[in-house]
Amino acid sequence: MGLSIGVHILNLLTIPALVFIYYFRKTEKVTFKGMVYATLIAGAILLFINNIIIPYTVWIGAQIDTLFVNTFGLPVNSGITLFALALIIGLGWAAWAAHRRGRVLLNIILLSTTMILVGYSSYASVTIRAAANPPMNSNNPNNPHALLSLLNRDQYGDRPLLYGAQYSAPPEGVKEKKVWYLDEDGKYKTATVLTGYTHAPEFMQLFPRMWNYSKGEKAYKEWAAYRTKTETLRDDKGEVLRDAQGRPMRGETLDFGRKRAYTDSYGETRTVTEPTFWENVHFFFNYQLSYMYWRYFMWNFVGRQSDIQPSRTTITDGNWLSGIRWIDEKYVGPQDNLPREIAENKGRNTYYFLPFLLGLIGLVYQLNRDQRNFSIVLWLFVMMGIALVFYFNTSPGEPRERDYVYAGSFYAFAMWIGFGVMAFKDLIVRLTKRDDRTAAVAATVIGLVVPGILCAENWDDHDRSGRTYAHDIGWNYLQSTLPNSIILNYGDNDTFPLWNNQEVYGVRPDVRIMNTSYLGGEWYIDEMKTKANDAPGVPFSLPKHKYTFNNDMIYVTNSIDRPVEIKEVIDFVRSDDPRSKVKLADGTLADYIPAKRIALPVNKENALASGIVAEKDRDKMVDTVFINIKKNSLDKNQLMILDMLANFDWKRPIYMTQVYILQDFGLMDYLQFDGYAYRFVPILTPYRQAGEVGRIDPEYAVPLLLDVFRYGNLDDEKVYSDYFTQYNLSAARAR
């Protein structure tokens, strides 16, 4: 179990099944009381490992390390190393003492805990690797406090399970947490971070499934509303719809939530729509269970409509499909005269319920023949399926399908499919009076129909041979860039292909890849400041205390109603003078940017020398690039981009994989499209419309498009271009 934690935390969900295996082996007569005790023990073990061993082992080591580093002046990680040695020696001595005194149960508990900790110690490799400061070092867990944050999955935040507030609940206050971090002087320091909001008791309720305030009423209403009401119909702009005679049109609409009034901090009365308890229950069954679990289950054992991921629930994409016409027509409508892209989609796989039915037969067979082992498989099925649905408390609008999360549950059902073959064997023996060997062969032949149809239906859309487009996206982005460039990207799809090319295949080690999604983390800013491969660090100038648990959001004002040079702006933010601060409502002082119009001078000679501008375009350069901040605040990642622009002095080309990275700075008029990536250039090209952003230098881009870029062998008819490949290819075309 300890080793499995090092592989994936979801392995803990096998604990109930393992406890029942032990219980069944140790008892001859299974009783209801015994099963209740076994369940309670399984829950206790699960909580002990997940809530005590995993967090508190490292937490104690982190506290000792803080004492050793801050008080005794010893090196970082010396305290947790001594604690680990003392823990191993202590557990070893305790287990030996328990053995000598004949304390069997205590000895088993101590040995089990020791083995769990031995496996858990594999996470020490994470700290060892981080200490080496590799080019890719997520969260930089080079000390026990950073490792603890990683293990606690702090970056994902908390979500309520049994009791809490819903998405519409107005915040009453903030939740804060003290965190430890390693400062530049080698000492541990503390900071206070915002972890959430507090809410008035009247906005707290049981079973809060609709908790994510970033989603809003529209996303939840689609899945949770089950009541209707008659009211005046309105269009998307809120205008009343009228018939030919000009009379207001009335119709049935979804009735959602209940109105609740409250008094805000300014003493004004406001109203919010609060979902009811039964709407939360409906959302749980309709979206979280049905759409986000049973739909995936049916994909695997009944069939799948297509490999197209819908942006929202539709009747044409993303559903299960059996291949049995009368069932499918009832569920997803008529299947005649379908568009070609639906009817010929290789992801349209139909199994005619055969795997599902064979699994049900196996389930009933095992239940009748071996109830003990049936309960073990059932524990695996439930814990890795329905229990995870409850724990994840998923919100609508997932960026990708999450069927892989429930693979363990589907493995359990596949066991019942195997028992279904055994059921056929027993049936053949009973009907034909043949020996077991002949019946086993016959049952196997019959059972092979299921994997046979799965193979026949899935082979074409799961065949990735020859398709290299995911890799080639990264290749193309990197090859778009000039030597010694910095390329800014956003999100997974624009990041991992670049990392793969650079770190695995050694493509363009001179380019610094910077993921702006991570740039809000102080660890990533520190990482970007250092050299990686052959690429120098990003020229940030703000000191560590300005971005370490600080300035997650910085205000932008028009205090100076004229363009201010960018270095002066960064110097203003860097200053600790109280006059360079703004006083917040709670009386604290915060950094701010005093101007929305910022001047970025152009060093033309550097721009020419670095290749940012070709010699033939010398006369097209402007003297100053003007940044126009359109918002009243910037996120930390945008502040750091501003810092980079203040200090790069046009010595290194800057690229973006998406034009919108610079949209909030008003810099979309200063881009050049180099085939895949956009180059930031001091040449004004007024923004025209989406898809026509920036200028193009044919002498630079055309050779790349024709001779350098790779397109994943998509011109080969034998290579399958699935939905995500087509989606990313369309995005590349749009750019």
Task: Please identify what each model-predicted range represents.
Residues 1, 9-406, 413-484, 496-735:
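ER/secretory pathway lumenal C-terminal domains and tails of membrane proteins involved
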